[in-house]
């Protein structure tokens, strides 16, 4: 009886210790503060961009330099704000979106200091997965992901052995008409048994995937995991910005990884 009583008291003490050492629920006011600060940063970026465009309207080189500086400043402030407000839902979500620009040690520290109600959120789980996963980089072997095509058929990656693969993470719309035209020319230039062009879209339903296929060229293979934003593909391949481009050679080695699709860069990596 005494041992049971001691065990009961020990359990209570452990619970009290846990509650006293665990951060409280997230502060709704800080969530509002972050949303306001983020909106302010975005507005300032747009205003300054317009000001620079007018100021350097006749000097494209200077405009480009200033635009790069402005973007770097905005990116830095964006990351700083996300880390500062990582104890809020929106801040934590932004940390996941910026995970490739934040050291994994910093991300681990963020997770360790989360309020209790955010520790088991989808964004916390996604960041955990990112931390423990080695992201695909140039020189590494291609890792197949379970995906389906726009008709709902599971992609059989073995069918693409001994082919070059151009894998594009979303963003055909972001490429613009000229970019899509260059991609179409690339498709015409190489036989399908030499080059497979695969476009991954982070959608939840087949209907959405079919819409992209219908909107753009049916000459490409459209695929998706039909999962939320923190899918295994995004985690393993370190894909966030659209489009992100991967070229996998005939030996299954990733030989190119870039944000944006530079068709000339792609062609250099394709082995006929």
Can you say where each PLM-predicted feature lies in the sequence?
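Bacterial Sec-dependent N-terminal signal peptides
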Residues: 1-29
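N-terminal "domain-start" segment that seeds a small globular fold
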Residues: 71-72, 123-157
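Loop/turn elements at helix/coil->beta-strand transitions in domains of secreted/extracellular proteins
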Residues: 161-165, 191-196, 217-220, 250
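Short acidic, S/G/P-rich loop/turn micro-motifs used as interaction or catalytic elements
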Residues: 172-175, 204, 262
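Structural microenvironment flanking redox-active thiols in thiol-disulfide oxidoreductases
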Residues: 178-216, 228-234
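Thiol/disulfide oxidoreductase modules built on the thioredoxin-like
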Residues: 218, 227-271
